[in-house]
Curated annotation (Swiss-Prot):
Effect of S1120A: Does not affect the stimulatoty effect of PKA inhibitor on calcium-stimulated adenylate cyclase activity
Gene: Adcy8
Mutagenesis / variant outcome for changing S611A: Does not affect the stimulatoty effect of PKA inhibitoron calcium-stimulated adenylate cyclase activity
Disulfide bond annotation, renumbered to this chain: none
InterPro entries found in the cross-reference section: A/G_cyclase (IPR001054), A/G_cyclase_CS (IPR018297), AC_N (IPR032628), Adcy (IPR030672), Adcy_conserved_dom (IPR009398), Nucleotide_cyclase (IPR029787)
Protein name (Swiss-Prot/TrEMBL): Adenylate cyclase type 8
Primary localization: membrane
Cofactor binding, per record: Binds 2 magnesium ions per subunit. Is also active with manganese (in vitro).
Length: 1248
């Protein structure tokens, strides 16, 4: 059978959604939302996962995230997994103190579902979760269906051989069990007959009968033993062969009975039992079962005609037997086909569940990769370990935290590409981005070889640190070697591209603080006085040389020749702070010797003539950004032994995870090996009644639509027709009452069929179709129809006995088939009342979805009625038949044999019903669990999209997620009209200090985090939705407007530039508000410019979105040459903004490094504010903001915890989800422990 969602005329929500809940409260639209603790917000997000997933029936549309500020969490976990809530696991030993600071959490924007932060809504497209293939995509032949009624076909298999093999293996245990039960039932019947014979028979048993009885019993016992003992080696094919052997044994017994060597009369009842068992209990394909059923029927009819002792007395009796066997074969075909269909449906649901869980793992892997594209592994490990140990009762006491690490004895390298500005004007966008990606990919490779950690790429600036996170005694040597290799590489670039480029490198040794600040566009960074010195060493250096400080020289221990650097002469900072500098002396021939990998590529490509931007075409080529995150192959990195010690045990599992049919099939094989169905049954289903232990789950199951209910009812109607035909061939002596009664029964059953299939006939009245729909969707109504159908068939089987006249029963003993006296009154053949009663019992088996306990109750009532009729009211009819037609060798009368036959059918039908109901309920459980996994997957996808939007603009994220990028170029884009803003805090350098009072600078960074977070919050207002934050550089905030493709064709061409100007004004107001609360006097120095830029994504391991061009350099210079507390713009920008309602003050002409050399001094203006409001800009209204990095990492931890909880349930409670499914690797693969890292700070309250 198939259990499907409701799809009635008026529609309905999916019934297997466990707890539909009302939508969460919205966050409101105030200009300043209430601040939240990130732990509280993330706990709310976690608890709302299923609420969002089930809202709207779990449809595939976009979903709005609720604002946790509006209301507290309202936990509605699915009942199926409600028992799986386990406490979080602590690390045990090895915990370290963590530094804390202030970050804020705000939910994602509403109104556009998964809309990106920069315009352009819609799903970013991580996974199309609701596009799973339908059953017809799997089946080779799904059967013939007409008006909702499914008719059997001979072939019912999957298209895929592997899928068919897995299906056969999946239900091998159940079919093995059915084979054993069938043989045991037959053996018990034989033993019962043997005991009755020994007790009741007047004469001893014929030796040949005893031998045959023992032989057939032995065969069936051996089959049972082989199937039970050798179950691990019993394949599906061998099980089919054992079924054939069982059928041969039973059919041979029919032959023996026909020859007079059986224990039951003429054996017609045993033939019916054999036919039913062949179709419903023996593990035979439908084609084999049909051939076996026809063979058994033909054998019995032949014996009845040819064997003298069994000779029938009329053609009507022969036809009645033929119709009887036809009816049993027809019902058996329906039962076998629809049962197999139900099992295949359950198997597909199992596969979908496994597939959903596999895809959930893939989503987790993507999320981990996204985190690792922002943070180094050791920081992620620190956050995960800390968050894993967060207890619910402590969440309320956790204040804003940041994760800042302090590392001593490190060396910092800054490198800048000289001549890059001119290069960016001569290359196309694609060539520029390709060149940068290849260049920085080589730098990343060199950094790995020289034990350096790349921190960030700032335009054409690259900086890295050695000694972080693993302390190294040779950190200074590593940076110097890194610098020398970079110079060799850039010189190779210069020789290949014919562009005048070089490297200016500065190195300083000391200590750093590292971590992530802000709420948007997370980027790992380092801060300290020593970082500033390294930066100034680079800017005051000489192209092609390595400029080092005295501190670095001391760490080199004289291993390199140096000369005076005279950095004070080239840089004001170095002169002001009296920093001694040196230049590494390196023989020119050493610099001309290229790195080994470049030499190999150059040799292999020596015949190339290429003066373009691409300089690497050899065997090595840089990876494309995000290929390891959103690519098709999602393989995980292995955990090192040291890194495993840093993770909680349940997060350090290792399993190679792939996606695709092969991996799904492997998972299903694991499921089969662990006999998951039996485990699910023990956990969720009651032993005898098979009802769910969870009442709400039972209610949902009972309301599931039964797609084969119409087919079952049609089959029951066919059985009634056969019963009518049998009793018409052997009619009652009173034809008129019999004709009336069967006419009424047929009309009643026809009405039942009509009322249950009416919804497929549009020509019928609407009220009738709605009634039909209601019946199909209502458990009680379906049961009423089922019981009415069974009652009609039962009445058809027994009602004719009411017209029998005891005085007119005629002896048939001495008549032959050719006798002139033909007696066709059914009262002369009372056993046919029993045979048709058996057909009525089989009607119960036809209704696959009927509860097995109800089936048992109905069967017991039938047997009780038959016992009443045969043993009391109509006992004389059966006794008269036995006296006249049975020999003295028959130790059982027709009454007793009939009750024994019905008892056999009762057990067989009940067991078959139990198997079918278990299959249906297992199917339902898999659906519920798969639905839960898909809902959780959707939440994870939203998490991933949030993370990706915090790395890339929304339209760029969609570029990487929606397209087939197998052969795609790097992402690059040219823009003609973009606004660029740099906002720095000049006073923060003087404010920053590394003393014991401020925890070695940590408290200063805590304040900087608050400032950046407030700036990020402003971007959550819809008036600034055209603005994208690019990065923070120390205490400098960089933002851009006009990047969204959707806004490029907007009528208000410079509306985004006006929004950028408004944003800069809002920043000045925000910093003033911060000054009030922190008792500081910070001022912003802001520079704005506009023009053309090149945007692109570079870096494979740590992808980074950036923009380049003269406009960027000019905006940066507008900041660096500006005045604190003022907003400086060039004349071109002034001319645009002055017509948009902004007021300015002319500053004058200033010298701008890198631009004035070619264009002379630049006229600049100070932006004062707005003269008049812009009518196109709405009043400030806060959109739900972004999740903080801590929030997303905690979401990842809680997702992994939920998986671990399910795994523990599977191991301890045998929940039936494959054990190996959750034994998975994580991406958190650090190089080793961090004994040199000092985690700074503790939890502290907000700043005053």
């Amino acid at each position: 059978m198939e259990l499907s969602d409701v799809h009635c005329l008026s529609g309905s929500e999916e019934l297997y959604t466990i707890h539909p809940t009302p939508p969460a409260a919205d966050g409101g639209s105030g200009s300043r939302p209430q601040r939240l603790l990130w732990q509280t917000a993330v706990r709310h997000i976690t608890e709302q996962r299923f609420i969002h997933g089930h809202r709207g029936g779990g449809g595939g549309g976009s979903r709005k995230a609720s604002n946790p500020a509006g209301s507290g969490p309202n936990h509605h976990a699915p009942q199926l997994s409600s028992d799986s809530v386990l406490p979080l696991y602590s690390l045990g030993s090895g915990e370290r103190a963590h530094n804390t600071g202030g970050t804020k959490v705000f939910p994602e924007r509403s109104g556009s579902g998964s809309a990106s932060g920069s315009g352009g809504g819609g799903d970013l497209g991580f996974l199309h979760l609701d596009c799973a293939p339908s059953n017809s995509d799997f089946f080779l032949n799904g059967g013939y269906s007409y008006r909702g009624v499914i008719f059997p076909t001979l072939r019912n298999s999957f298209k895929s051989r592997d899928l068919e093999r897995l299906y056969q293996r999946y239900f091998l245990g159940q079919r093995r069990k059915s084979e054993v039960v069938m043989n045991v039932l037959d053996v018990l019947t034989k033993l019962t007959l043997l005991v009755l014979h020994l007790s009741l028979a007047s004469a001893p048993m014929d030796p040949l009968k005893g031998i045959l009885l023992g032989f057939f019993t032995g065969i069936e016992v051996v089959i049972c033993a082989l199937v039970v003992v050798r179950k691990d080696t019993t394949s599906h094919t061998y099980l089919q062969y054992s079924g054939v052997v069982t059928w041969v044994a039973m059919t041979t017994q029919i032959l023996a009975a026909g020859l007079g060597y059986g224990l039951l009369g003429d054996g017609i009842g045993y033939v019916l039992f054999t036919l039913f068992a062949t179709y419903s209990m023996l593990p035979l394909p439908l084609t084999w079962a049909i051939l076996a059923g026809l063979g058994t029927s033909l054998l019995q009819v032949t014996l009845q005609v040819l064997i003298p002792r069994l000779a029938v007395f009329s053609i009507n009796q022969v036809l009645a037997q033929v119709v009887l066997f036809m009816c049993m074969n027809t019902a058996g075909i329906f039962i076998s086909y629809l049962s197999d269909r139900a099992q295949r449906q359950a198997f597909l649901e199992t596969r979908r569940c496994v597939e959903a869980r596999l895809r959930l793992e893939t989503e987790n892997q993507r999320q981990e990769r996204l985190v690792l594209s922002v943070l180094p592994r050791f920081v992620v490990l620190e956050m995960i370990n800390d968050m894993t140990n967060v207890e619910d009762e402590h969440l309320q006491h956790q204040f804003h935290r940041i994760y800042i690490h302090r590392y001593e004895n490190v060396s910092i390298l800054f490198a800048d590409v000289k001549g890059f500005t001119n290069l960016s004007t001569t290359l196309s966008a694609q060539e520029l981005v390709r060149m940068l990606n290849e260049l920085f990919a080589r730098f990343d490779r060199l950094a790995h070889e020289h034990h350096c950690l790349r921190i960030k790429i700032l335009g054409d600036c690259y900086y890295c640190v050695s000694g972080l996170p693993e302390p190294r005694q040779d950190h200074a040597h590593c940076c110097v070697e890194m610098g020398l290799s970079m110079i060799k590489t850039i010189r190779f670039v210069r020789s290949r591209t014919k562009h005048d480029v070089d490297m200016r490198i500065g190195i300083h040794s000391g200590s750093v603080l590292c971590g992530v600040l802000g709420l948007r566009k997370w980027q790992f960074d380092v801060w300290s006085w020593d970082v500033d010195i390294a930066n100034k060493l680079e800017s005051g250096g000489i192209p092609g040389r390595i400029h080092i400080s005295k501190a670095t020289l001391d760490c080199l221990s004289g291993d390199y020749n140096v000369e005076e650097g005279h950095g004070k002469e080239r840089n004001e900072f170095l002169r002001k702070h009296n920093i001694e500098t040196y230049l590494i002396k390196q023989p020119e021939e050493s610099l001309l010797s290229l790195p080994e990998d470049i030499v190999k590529e150059s040799v292999s490509c020596s015949d190339r003539r290429n003066s373009g931007a691409t300089f690497t075409e050899g065997s090595w080529s840089p990876e494309l950004p995000f290929d390891n995150i959103v690519g098709k192959q999602n393989t995980l990195a292995a955990l090192t032994r040291n890194s495993i010690n840093l993770l909680p045990n349940h997060l350090a599992q290792a399993l190679h995870v792939q996606s695709g049919p092969e991996e799904i099939n492997k998972r299903i094989e694991h499921t089969i090996d662990l006999r998951s169905g039996d485990k699910l049954r023990r956990e969720h289903i009651k032993p005898f009644s098979l009802m769910f232990k969870d009442s709400s789950l039972e209610h949902k199951y009972s309301q599931m639509r039964d797609e084969v209910f119409k087919s079952n009812l049609v089959c029951a109607f066919i059985v009634l027709l056969f019963i009518t035909a049998i009793q018409s061939l052997l009619p009652s002596s009173r034809l008129m009452p019999m004709t009336i009664q069967f006419s009424i029964l047929i009309m009643l059953h026809s009405a039942l069929v009509l009322i249950t299939t009416a919804e497929d006939y549009k020509c019928l009245p609407l009220i009738l179709r709605k009634t039909c729909c209601w019946i199909n969707e209502t458990y009680l109504a379906r049961n009423v129809i089922i019981f009415a159908s069974i009652l009609i068939n039962f009445l058809g089987a027994v009602i004719n006995i009411l017209w029998c006249d005891f005085d007119k029963s005629i002896p048939l003993k001495n008549l032959t088939f050719n006798s002139s006296a033909v007696f066709t009154d059914i009262c002369s053949y009372p056993e046919y009342f029993v045979f048709t009663g058996v057909l009525a019992m089989v009607t119960c088996a036809v209704f696959l979805r009927l509860n097995s306990v109800l089936k048992l109750a109905v069967l017991l009532i039938m047997i009780a009625i038959y016992a009443l009729l045969t043993e009391t009211i109509y006992a004389g009819l059966f006794l008269s038949y036995d006296n006249l037609n049975h020999s003295g060798e028959d130790f059982l009368g027709t009454k007793e044999a009939s009750l024994l036959l019905m008892a056999m059918f009762l057990l067989a039908v009940f067991y078959h019903g139990q198997q079918l109901e278990y299959t249906a309920r297992l199917d339902f459980l898999w659906r519920v669990q798969a639905k839960e996994e898909i809902n959780e997957m959707k939440d994870l996808r939203e998490h991933n999209e949030n993370m990706l939007r915090n790395i890339l603009p929304g339209h760029v994220a969609r570029h990487f997620l929606e397209k087939d990028r197998d052969n795609e170029e790097l992402y690059s884009q040219s823009y003609d009209a973009v606004g660029v803003m740099f906002a720095s805090i000049p006073g923060f350098a003087d404010f920053y200090s590394q003393t014991e009072m401020n925890n070695q600078g940590v408290e200063c960074l805590r304040l900087l985090n608050e400032i950046i977070a407030d700036f990020d919050e402003l971007l959550g207002e819809d008036r600034f939705q055209d603005i994208e934050k690019i990065k923070t550089i120390g205490s400098t905030y960089m933002a851009v407007s006009g990047l969204s493709p959707e806004k490029q064709q907007c009528e208000d061409k410079w509306g985004h530039l006006c929004a950028l100007a408004d944003f800069s004004l809002a920043l000045t107001e925000s910093i003033q508000e911060i000054n009030k609360h922190s008792f500081n006097n910070f001022e912003l120095r802001i520079g704005i410019s506009h023009g053309s830029v090149v945007a692109g994504v570079i870096g494979a391991k740590k992808p980074q979105y950036d923009i380049w061009g003269k406009t960027v350099n000019l905006a940066s210079r507008m900041d660096s040459t500006g005045v604190s507390g003022r907003i400086q713009v060039p004349e071109e920008t002034y001319l645009i903004l002055k017509d948009q309602g902004f007021a300015f003050d002319y500053r004058g002409e200033i010298y701008v490094k890198g631009i004035s050399e070619q264009e002379g001094k630049i006229k600049t203006y100070f932006l004062l504010g707005r003269v008049q409001p812009n009518p196109f800009i709405l009043p400030p209204r806060r959109l739900p903001g972004q999740y903080s990095l801590a929030a997303v990492v905690l979401g990842l931890v809680q997702s992994l915890n939920r998986q671990r909880q399910k795994q523990l349930l599977n191991e301890n409670s045998n929940s039936g989800i494959i054990k190996s499914h959750y034994n998975r690797r994580t991406l958190l693969t650090p190089s080793g422990p961090e004994p040199g890292a000092q985690a700074e700070g503790t939890d502290k309250s907000d700043l005053p």
